[in-house]
Design a protein with these regions (language model features):
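Hydrophobic packing and interface segments
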Residues: 1-705
Length: 705
């Protein structure tokens, strides 16, 4: 059975080839006028410069962590930490970095091409931007499959590890590098993009009264660079980590659940099927000229829903062939993941799209000023957690019992029963099911920043108003699809985090003869819960204040240029775009390290003081509060953004009105919500889990309590 894992290579090759074909297709389109090409080159140059400095900084941190892991692994003779983990940490980080880099390269080559295509038709603009997003989506899933398959064959055949439990426990540790890189990319990119966005909007729109992406705004280029480093490179690393993490967590649970190599093969096979279904669905994304937002949403839904339905149909024979009769219960769990993912996507769309009542009512709140629209957005975000949490709760319960879980959790020796582990395997495979069609889901997400950049280039290049109207329609759709993509990532993170938590407990129990109390009656578990809950809020505070400080420097700089460079407002002098790009780069690199290190230091210190039971409490606390906070922030931010777009479309006074200025203030509050703190939380949840698993041996050996 284990020899069938070569299908992972097949999935990687298919995804890679499709990504290359889509990239060639995009590069075949015209990049527009000379001015459009120069603007695109400036954005590309700024994005490349930032990523070069970010990766240089991150690699230094990676080197330090690698040495620490290496010392622990070899000094303990592999007892505290597998000798493979330090090297898997490096490869996971490199693949995650590469996923973001490839996505950003194609995005910065597609923005002007999308603007030029939009000058011809709305459908052509949609196709170019979506094809660019497809490169990102299929690169992520292809690299993920390649990484997992290479490590499986190395461990199984090169090093002769034939025990599924041992192999699964080693493999689950491999996700730490990807999670670590993803957190740096998301936090750093999020700080950059939102500092530029907030600074550009507050001074440009509110104070100077000039349109979005106006060439007179010194922060315009930095804003467009930020779309790429945060919403493309950061998101690519983020979802690569989510994809790989969900599969690896299921690997570990398959072994202890008694499914062996067959249970490990299932998530791989499901991922390959998802790649093929995503390719089919991508060909169905198209629209008519002058399409409404509802019609544009329908075009993307057609592709994503078709892929999900095909994956659901093909998953049934996979489950039966690999797991026999037990496969039918696992199939129900996969359906829970697929349906849950689509349901989260729908309700995210409902709360954030301006075609629905919640965002329209939020836009109406601008009639009474910025305070009421901010209050309304917070209320909307808080309310939106209800549906997401209920969907995930239902998916957890149904998948657990369908896969063979029971109410009896532990046996007489205090270890988890096989039935409990089978149920947890069901929850893990539900997470894989939710992300199985990530190729097309991520394509619809990565398309958004490209459309946003295209609108900026159209404005700065002085293209006709009808072109800007088309790019605005695509941009507004992108805001909704971005929120939907974040919903998928957050939902899958909650399922994966639960699977990783149980993997941690299993690994701890396998390495100690002590009977540990992991229930709420343990004071260390309770204290850990409080620390985990606190970590969510402190981490969010770190990322929000980082954006605040970086945005303040941009606001001061833009005001200075308007004041000290005569002729900017009359188009007689060019702003100093490079200075704003430099400030954003410095701010993001300086501010991203502290939040990222929290995810490593807090679980490790908690474990060394409170022991393994305290870590379980921490993981439970950060998972629950982090999930709810991430949904709240992402949906509130998306709604504020689209409420502003709704007003710019001619409602409630339109562009330049007092209502519009109030909506811009709401949007600037929502920017770090939806693009920095919110999406970073789902990485925090999983990184805490993988860090705890990696350092479980050290914690067992040296804890105080």
């Amino acid at each position: 059975m284990d020899k069938l894992f070569w299908i992972g290579f097949v999935g990687a090759v298919v995804a890679g080839l499709f990504a290359v074909l889509q990239a060639k297709k995009v590069m075949g389109y015209s990049e527009g006028t000379e001015k459009m090409q120069k603007l695109a080159a400036s954005i590309r140059e700024g994005a490349n410069a930032y990523l070069k400095r970010q990766y240089t900084t991150v690699l230094k941190v990676f080197a330090i962590v690698f040495v620490v892991l290496l010392v622990i692994a070899f000094a303990s003779g592999g007892k505290m930490l597998s000798k493979f983990t330090p090297f898997a940490f490096i490869t996971g980080g490199i693949w995650s970095m590469l996923a973001g880099l490839v996505g950003m390269k194609i995005a910065t080559s597609s923005n002007a091409r999308t603007a030029q295509a939009a000058s011809e038709s709305l459908n052509k603009g949609l196709r170019v931007a979506f094809s660019s997003g497809s490169v990102m989506g299929f690169t992520v899933v292809g690299l993920g499959m390649l990484d997992i398959t290479i490590w499986f064959f190395l461990l199984r055949y090169a090093f002769g590890i034939d025990d599924p439990v041992q192999l699964g426990n080693i493999m689950v540790m491999n996700g730490m590098g990807a999670s670590f890189m993803a957190l740096f990319a998301r936090v750093g990119g999020g700080i950059y993009t939102k500092a530029a966005d907030v600074g550009a909007d507050l001074v440009g729109k509110v104070e100077a009264g000039i349109p979005e992406d106006d060439p007179r705004n010194p922060a315009t280029i930095a804003d467009n660079v930020g779309d790429n480093v945060g919403d493309v490179a950061g998101m690519g690393a983020d979802l690569y980590e989510s994809y790989v993490g969900s599969i690896l967590a299921t690997f570990a649970l398959s072994a202890v659940g008694g499914y062996g190599f067959a249970g490990m093969l299932l998530p791989m096979a499901l991922a390959v099927v998802g790649i093929i279904c995503s390719i089919i669905g991508s060909f169905l994304v198209k629209t008519k000229e002058n399409a409404s937002q509802q019609a544009l949403l329908k075009s993307l839904r057609t592709g994503t829903y078709t892929a999900a339905i095909l994956a659901a149909v093909l998953a049934a024979p996979l489950c039966f062939l690999l797991l026999g009769k037990a496969g039918w219960g696992v199939y129900v769990a996969i359906l829970c993941g697929l349906i849950g993912g689509c349901a989260i996507g729908y309700f995210t769309e409902y709360y954030t799209s301006d075609t629905y009542k919640p965002t329209q009512e939020l836009a109406a709140a601008s009639e009474t000023g910025s305070a009421t629209i901010i209050i309304g957005g917070i209320s909307l975000g808080l309310k939106s957690t209800l549906t997401s949490i209920l969907i995930v709760a239902a998916a957890v319960l149904i998948s657990y019992f369908a896969a063979g879980g029971s109410k009896t959790i532990v046996d007489g020796a205090g270890h988890f029963t096989e039935a409990f582990n089978k149920g947890l395997y069901g929850i893990g495979i539900a997470g894989v099911g939710m992300l199985s069609t990530l190729g097309i889901t991520l394509a619809t997400d990565a398309y958004g920043p490209v459309a946003d950049n295209a609108g900026g280039i159209a404005e700065m290049a002085g293209l006709p108003e009808e072109v800007r109207e088309r790019t605005d329609a695509l941009d507004s759709l992108g805001n909704t699809t971005a929120a939907t993509g974040k919903g998928f990532a957050i939902g899958s993170a909650s399922l994966t985090a639960l699977a990783l938590l149980v993997s941690y407990v299993n690994i701890v129990q396998d390495n100690t003869e002590e009977i540990l109390n992991f229930t709420l009656t343990s004071p260390t578990v309770l204290v850990g819960l409080f620390i985990g809950a606190m970590l969510t809020f402190v981490f969010s505070a770190f990322t929000m204040s980082a954006v605040q400080r970086a945005a303040q420097s941009i606001v001061v700089e833009v005001r200075r240029q308007f004041k000290e460079i005569p002729g900017i407002m009359e188009y007689k002098a060019d702003p100093d775009y490079a200075q704003c790009v430099s400030l954003c780069t410095q701010g993001a690199l300086h501010e991203m390290v502290a939040p990222a290190l929290l995810a490593i230091i807090v679980p490790l210190v908690t474990g060394l003081i409170l022991g393994p039971t305290g870590v379980v409490g921490l993981l439970g606390g950060v998972s629950v509060t982090g999930f709810a906070m991430a949904v709240f922030m992402s949906n509130a931010g998306g709604a504020w953004d689209n409420a502003k777009k709704y007003i710019e479309g001619g409602h409630h006074g339109g562009k330049g009105s007092e209502q519009h200025k109030a909506a811009v203030v709401g949007d600037t509050v929502g920017d770090p919500f939806k693009d920095t703190s919110g999406p970073s939380l789902n990485i925090l949840i999983k990184l805490c889990s993988t860090v705890s698993i990696v350092f479980s041996g050290l914690i067992l050996a040296f804890h105080l309590i």
